[in-house]
């Protein structure tokens, strides 16, 4: 069944790019009733999907025109994470109805896979895909799980240390890791059994929030409590840690771009931060809006996207 949609053309109010060094920054305001973007996912065609969490919708932005389309996800929806899958469709961790959701990119038909009975409200967070096309996901209330879209079979496991599973990522080699904010660890998942192997970061109670893999399969972690960005090298079993600039940084999101440069959001600085691992240097891009609250970062070659949930807009950082 086709869902009703709302479309807005915002080309007249798109903010022009602002240049800073080799980066051009451009903001895209979102329409009334379709703001509070939580996560973003960039499609292969360069358009951007985002979760409008407070209105229970999935947004779709065309950066070339500023047009925003809003797709309702149903009564009670409160979408959190979104990722474009290997099928080209946006997949969503839909926390409001405790389900994994797919939106057909052509028809806009919404399909949902509810969590099995007995697991309660999971506070679903983030998802990723393995090399077999299966969806792996986290729930902050203490679970992680796996969905086989072909059959609808879903497995859910209790996380070690209970509450906390947050960000999740797939490495180029196909391994899957997640971070636990409340548990202060990362874990590698066995793709056959679902078992989680805990890996302890060197800083105690660091608050590992989100994770991303670089081209070499190393795991980058944003540490919310400690204000660090850390890197775990699975081949060596070794950690490296860097503190973000400022007195009391709060590292929320982390994303590694196609050149293995690391991007983070720092809530204390109200900024997006770029980290060059080779030079071990940081560059800070403060938002021009107060309390922008970037909760996630994602991108494609040459550009990084930041959803500013506190400013109701999406911001692109493009390499010039």
Regions found by a protein language model. Name each.
Residues 224, 247-274:
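Loop/turn-rich, solvent-exposed surfaces of beta-rich toroidal or solenoidal domains
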Residues 33-45, 75-87, 118-132, 161-173, ...:
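Beta-rich, blade/repeat-based domains predominating
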Residues 21-34:
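A short helix->beta-strand "capping" segment at the edge of beta-propeller domains
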Residues 7-15:
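Bacterial N-terminal signal peptides
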Residues 57-60, 98-102, 142-146, 185-188, ...:
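A short loop-to-beta-strand structural motif that recurs across blades of beta-propeller domains
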Residues 62-66, 104-108, 148-152, 190-194, ...:
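Short loop/turn segments that connect beta-strands within beta-propeller blades
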Residues 48-54, 90-97, 135-141, 177-182, ...:
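Conserved beta-strand positions in repeat-built beta-propeller and related beta-rich domains
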Residues 26-29, 69-73, 111-115, 155-159, ...:
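Beta-propeller fold detector
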């Amino acid at each position: 069944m086709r869902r009703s949609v709302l479309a807005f053309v915002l080309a007249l109010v798109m903010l022009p790019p602002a240049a800073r060094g080799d980066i051009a920054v451009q903001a895209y305001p979102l329409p009334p009733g379709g703001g509070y973007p939580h996560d973003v996912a960039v499609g292969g065609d360069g358009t951007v999907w985002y979760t409008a969490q407070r209105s229970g919708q999935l947004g779709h932005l065309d950066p070339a025109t500023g047009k925003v389309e809003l797709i309702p996800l149903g009564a009670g929806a409160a979408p959190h994470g979104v990722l474009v899958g290997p099928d080209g469709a946006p997949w969503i961790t839909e926390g409001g109805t405790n389900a994994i959701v797919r939106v057909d990119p052509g028809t806009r038909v919404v399909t949902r896979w509810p969590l099995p009975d007995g697991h309660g409200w999971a506070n679903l967070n983030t998802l990723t895909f393995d090399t077999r096309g299966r969806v792996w996901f986290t729930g902050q209330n203490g679970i992680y799980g796996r969905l086989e879209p072909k059959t609808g079979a879903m497995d859910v496991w209790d996380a070690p240390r209970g509450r906390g599973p947050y960000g999740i990522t797939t490495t180029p080699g196909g391994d899957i890791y997640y971070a636990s904010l409340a548990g202060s660890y990362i874990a590698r998942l066995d793709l056959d059994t679902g078992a989680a192997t805990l890996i302890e970061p060197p800083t105690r109670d660091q608050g590992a929030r989100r994770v991303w893999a670089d081209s070499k399969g190393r795991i980058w972690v944003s540490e919310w409590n400690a204000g660090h960005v850390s890197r775990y090298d699975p081949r060596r079993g070794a950690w490296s840690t860097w503190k973000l600039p400022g007195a009391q940084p709060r590292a929320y999101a982390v994303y590694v771009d196609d050149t293995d440069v690391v991007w983070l959001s720092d809530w204390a600085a109200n900024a997006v931060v770029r980290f060059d691992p080779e030079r071990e240097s940081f560059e800070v891009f403060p938002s021009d809006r107060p309390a922008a609250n970037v909760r996630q970062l994602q991108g494609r070659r040459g550009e990084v996207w930041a959803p500013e949930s506190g400013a109701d807009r999406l911001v692109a950082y493009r390499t010039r």
